[in-house]
Amino acid sequence: MVEGWHRASRLVVDAAAIRQNVKKEIERLDPQSELFAVVKANGYGHGLIPVARYTEQAGATGFCVAILDEALTLREAGFAEPILVLGITNVKWAALAAEKNVSLTVGDVEWLTKAAPQLTAEHPLKVHLALDTGMGRIGFQESDGLNQAAELLTNDPRFVFEGVFTHFATADEKDPTYFNLQVDRFHKLVDTLPEKPRYVHVSNTATSLWHAACNGNLIRFGVGIYGMNPSGTVLEPPYDLQPAMTLESQLSFSKLLKKGRSVSYGATYTVEQDEWIGTVPIGYADGYPRCLQGFHVLVDGHFCEIVGRVCMDQLMIRLPHEYPAGTSVILAGKSQGKSISMTDIADYAGTINYEITCGFTERIPRVYKNNDIVK
């Protein structure tokens, strides 16, 4: 996608905030535990390579991604740390993963038997076995299949049994009932293994923040890197998470609309008195949700309502008085003591903060501050 460097809209990513969030979490961990930075989905929209570098600087000892392509991109950028692909990879790429020293997630024995002929003992494939303890997504549910896979990995020099893990569905909720059920299922399955792999891990950001007693020796730290609360506003984190992303723009146009004039597609907003309306060059093609009509942005410390439907490339706001083109607009971030968070946007849109940042498209340039890394 073409990046819009010749318009005012920018995503400003704070390297210092990312480093601080990672360091704060590492300080809470057992000395024997490692933190792998989850940088999938273009670093939750913040930029894969820059975020990987910042987290590496802060003490992350490895990375988690969703797909093999993300892992290969990290390798091509020169990262030598361990990389775990959390999703299931097509078995035909097993040899490539082994060659690039990328660890893969496996959830059934058949995958291993199909992969084995492609592999060599000189370049063994590192494997983490996924356990489905209640997420209903991927992994072994019963001990028989788990132990069959573990035995194959242990006895075949073409594999390295590197890890076993699960993922919790409700670690960010107040009611611990289902979480505790998953913990119990995980321990019962792992306890059947005659020999444990190097990594036994369960903790995403939410688990590590609110259920640290469950931490294994590897933490998959994700949304916390970016300063977002995985529970939204349901639970308070044990330390202040520093938001790493600001979405800013400028007024591209400002005009006085007379009483009775309407704004945007569908004419869903009609001014009831003469009003100053500003246009901001950002829209749903940039990942700013179309449903945010009625939400607000910040101009000069004022909350300004988004009026009319959000367009593909532009949106309109009601101004308290005249402002010239070029006036700063904060869509997410701070202005004169007031703020709009990604969670605020998500709550209005009926979704979660992760989806908001992941949804910002490449058309919005990412600008990095507090670091000398240039995209």
Swiss-Prot record:
InterPro entries: Ala_racemase, Ala_racemase/Decarboxylase_C, Ala_racemase_C, Ala_racemase_N, Ala_racemase_pyridoxalP-BS, PLP-binding_barrel. The modification N6-(pyridoxal phosphate)lysine is found at residue 40. It holds the Pfam family Ala_racemase_C. GO terms for cellular component: cytosol. Gene3D superfamilies: Alanine racemase, Lyase, Ornithine Decarboxylase, Chain A, domain 1. Substrate binds at residues 137, 312. The active site is at residues 40, 265. GO terms for molecular function: alanine racemase activity; pyridoxal phosphate binding. The keyword Isomerase applies. Keywords: Isomerase, Pyridoxal phosphate. Its EC number is 5.1.1.1. Its cofactor is pyridoxal 5'-phosphate. Pathway: Amino-acid biosynthesis; D-alanine biosynthesis; D-alanine from L-alanine: step 1/1. The keyword Transport does not apply. Coiled coil: none annotated. It catalyses: L-alanine = D-alanine. One of its GO terms (biological process) is peptidoglycan biosynthetic process. Belongs to the alanine racemase family. Catalyzes the interconversion of L-alanine and D-alanine. This is Alanine racemase. The gene is alr.
